[in-house]
Amino acid sequence: MMRRVAAILACVLAWVFALAQDYTFSNHNIVPFSLNPAQVGAANTIRIGANYRMQWPTLVNNYHTFRLSYDMNVYKQMCSVGAFYSYDQMSDVYKVNEAGVAYAHTIKCADNHFVRLGLQGSVFFNFVDLNSLTFGDQYSGTGAITPKSVENFESGSRTFFDFAVGASYVFQNHLTVGFAVYHVAQPDNGFVRGTQVLHRKYVGHVNFIQDLKLSHGLRSKGFSDNYFFANLTYQQQADFKQAYIGAGVCFQPIILGVSFKTDVQEVHTVSFMLGGYYKGFQLYYIFDLFTSHKKNGSWSNEISFIYTLPHKKKDLCPVVYW
């Protein structure tokens, strides 16, 4: 059993080092401005978010991702600023820390029509525990493991700066269409300099909300506490692709959602969301169920907490949707 776990972890580590793939959440719409820096300040108020994901929990050394964020509007809600910190840990071997700031500017094109432009800058602090790794040349024909390897790494840590840009079109806060590019300069991410770059990630997303109680469509100017929401997202980073579609309903104070996620090849996941909110507090739980034969540890969990400062006037849109 331990050999099987070790083999799985070795393959996973090789996959991460080879592709330099970003972490991902099942529901980025409750992970503030994680898909597009243009979505900074989209809640139209002060917003604090904390998100946690545990992946492959059936393995001995699983995968943990944590993100903390803050964003708000300034200057008549046309300018928005935000800051975030994320921590991504694979087993006890590979750890990624990212801290960054983001800015978005809203341009009014016509009544109810807006364009948002966003820019994000961040710094990465990556660490790998070289002492916990065993390389191929350390295995002898007798089954013994020699203490040293000929593999040469300059350092077990890596620090570099990164940038992202994004844009979105918003119609009355009911329909949002956006596109973003992360790792614009494709920074060097390797522990041996010049051998690995962090590939650009391209993101496209569409979000729609339909009021249920008041029968308001795209041209309504407000929302009741009951509404339907839907989301389409596509991400691509080098050879890695991910597409998902999600939908759900909100009946105050309960929010329910379901989504389907796929890498467009072999790995498919169905996610279920249960959420609730009271005044400015929101709490969500997401369960991922792998439906393909490549189960990668079978299932995953996500927990998200969001607090939004109550508005002095009625918000024009629900703060969060799937």
Indicate residue ranges for each PLM-predicted region:
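Positively charged n-region of N-terminal signal peptides that target proteins for export
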Residues: 1-5, 109-111
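Generic extreme N-terminus detector
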Residues: 5-6, 24
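Short, glycine/serine-rich, charged loops/turns that create anion-binding
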Residues: 12-13, 185
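Sec/Tat signal peptide C-region and signal peptidase I cleavage site
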Residues: 13-20
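Subset of outer-membrane beta-barrel
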Residues: 21-322
